Amino acid sequence: RILNVARRVKRWHDHGHKVVVVVSAMSGETNRLLALAKAITETPDPRELDQMVSTGEQVTISMLSMALNSIGVAAKSLTGRQVGIKTDSAFTKARIESIDTDVMTEHLDAGRVIVVAGFQGFDADGNTTTLGRGGSDTSGVALAAALKADECQIYTDVDGVYTTDPRVAPKAKKVDRISFEEMLEMASLGSKVLQIRSVEFAGKYQVPLRVLSSFDNDNDGAFDEDFKQN
């Protein structure tokens, strides 16, 4: 799976695009880390919990960077702290306050692909913070906004946005275009395609979003029409 992602990133890079990849932990890893914490205490300290669960993404960014370098793409892995994602101090559910783009711009201008640990940042005291479940979506949208990216692509385990969960309802219809208000409503009603905070962030900063399948290389996904108009 990591090598498949690397090959997809390489295609974009080879076409001359500046690419920032935001990744989450491997499937099941965050739950495994949470279980380890709960084995120690039923009420783990939120600061220590963030310090612990943020390591899942750090493993993934290193693996993807290794994979990219192995196929001839210069890549650099960066944690939320290293990439300059500053948050408040609400451990386990922090909100992004600002992003320093200097480090990213330096690497992008040098022709490198940046692989960023999603779901995490740091507060004013230098503590590691996490953004809550699905926070990697928010990280990706926030970085796209900060860099004024042409588009933010969100890869999921379904090939776009559906009227309902296609894994539960086989007759669910795929939506090619969707307004911001509709996407926000779906997220607020429990749609697992995007984290609601990431949708709010995208609307606020007018980030063009495209939802794509992690398994389908040829699918165009669903595009948020509101964003394209700006």
Summary of predicted features, one role per range:
Residues 1-200, 224-225:
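Nucleotide/pyrophosphate-binding catalytic subdomain
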Residues 186-218, 222, 229-230:
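A conserved active-site cap/scaffold subdomain adjacent to cofactor or substrate pockets
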